[in-house]
Curated annotation (Swiss-Prot):
EC number: 3.4.21.92
Family indicated by similarity: Belongs to the peptidase S14 family.
Localization annotation: Mitochondrion
Any single biological process term in GO: proteolysis
Subunit architecture: Homotetradecamer.
Active site positions: S127, H152
Coiled-coil regions listed in the entry: none
Name under which the protein is recorded: ATP-dependent Clp protease proteolytic subunit 2, mitochondrial
UniProt superkingdom: Eukaryota
Gene: CLPP2
Organism per entry: Arabidopsis thaliana (Mouse-ear cress)
Length: 241
């Protein structure tokens, strides 16, 4: 969902009611978070699975993009850059989208930091999430074969005095124009092509998203360089234990 400044239309699949509130992170957490136990000469150390993945420079954006998601992802990006500004960060996306302002905070931080960011779509990258997918480093934007990508214009709702409604309408149009320009920047498509495809919900297969310029590659197994990054981090952690 790419929501406007206030609210927006819901997609066919909504957030499950059984989903628990987030715990210390903006990632929407289920009632059971897997824990990872690591053994070293100093004893055992327990991590929740997302914290362990962060050690591998992996960030997961699961579920709707909102302020909770945004402030955690921004903090993770800044932290990983401070750890090693030249080493890649890997962002996995499975999201229906969400609030534009929250998504743009993540987007701007992705562009702001010096670390290259690879993006990987699994499940879906719809609305605002599709922009984050496209915003990865060139040549490093990927999707798994059965994922779905969707782009559309922002939507919003506002009630109040007529002049205030007019003001908010102009703001939503301004945001729409800005988003169109960002898709032009990252896809290489002409503005009129982007605007026409953004006019309504436009669903794409990974191959169609590749042709449109949102991703660079459709993959069905983990790229070797991602495996090397993970192994390298693990070896470094063990040597420092």
């Amino acid at each position: 969902m790419m929501r406007g400044l206030v609210s927006g239309a819901k997609m066919l699949s909504s957030t499950p009611s059984s989903m628990a509130t987030s715990i210390a992170t903006g990632r929407r957490s289920y009632s059971l978070i897997p824990m990872v136990i690591e053994h070293s000469s100093r004893g055992e150390r327990a991590y929740d699975i997302f914290s362990r993945l962060l050690k591998e420079r992996i960030i997961c954006i699961n579920g709707p993009i909102n302020d909770d998601t945004s402030h955690v992802v921004v903090a993770q990006l800044l932290y990983l850059e401070s750890e090693n500004p030249s080493k890649p960060i890997h962002m996995y996306l499975n999201s229906p989208g969400g609030h534009v302002t929250a998504g743009l905070a993540i987007y701007d931080t992705m562009q702001y930091i010096r670390s290259p960011i690879s993006t990987i779509c699994l499940g879906q990258a719809a609305s605002m999430a599709s922009l984050l997918l496209a915003a990865g480093a060139k040549g490093q934007r990927r999707s798994l074969p059965n994922a779905t990508v969707m782009i559309h214009q922002p939507s919003g709702g506002y009630s109040g005095q007529a002049k205030d409604i007019t003001i908010h309408t102009k703001q939503i149009v301004r945001v729409w124009d800005a988003l169109n320009e960002l898709y032009v920047k990252h896809t290489g498509q002409p503005l009129d092509v982007v605007a026409n495809n953004m006019d309504r919900d436009h669903f794409m297969t990974p191959e169609e998203a590749k042709a449109f310029g949102i991703i660079d590659e459709v993959i069905d197994e983990r790229p070797l360089e991602l495996v090397k990054d993970a192994v390298g981090n693990e070896s470094k952690d063990k040597s420092s234990s």
